[in-house]
Amino acid sequence: MSLTQILLILFVGILVTTPHDIFIIIKELKKIKAYLINIKSSIVKNIDEPLETEQVNFYLKKIINLEGYYHGSYDLTTIKEKYYTLIINNDLIENESVPDITEKH
């Protein structure tokens, strides 16, 4: 079907529609839009799930290397918070144990 045929069909369709039909068409277009948004979110969710699992595993390995164990929620944000608090605490401990050579005695 060529572009001119499609345009001709649309033009004739617009000419024969009644005001009642316009509301039905708008309603159906909204349903199609909602369906497409649902498909898009489903695709994005299926792509993001493995990435989130990889991130959780990455941070868990880092936490276990620092602390030796992990007890808590396996939510990505919780694990990230735990990791960053461990990093900050380890940096503070390392900074306290290193003598300050700039001090004059």
Curated annotation (Swiss-Prot):
It comes from the Bacteria. It is a single-pass membrane protein. InterPro entries: DUF2672 (IPR022718). It is found in: Membrane. The chain crosses the membrane at residues 4-26. Keywords: Membrane, Transmembrane, Transmembrane helix. Pfam families: DUF2672. GO terms for cellular component: membrane. This is Uncharacterized protein RC0089. It comes from Rickettsia conorii (strain ATCC VR-613 / Malish 7). The lineage of its organism: Bacteria, Pseudomonadati, Pseudomonadota, Alphaproteobacteria, Rickettsiales.
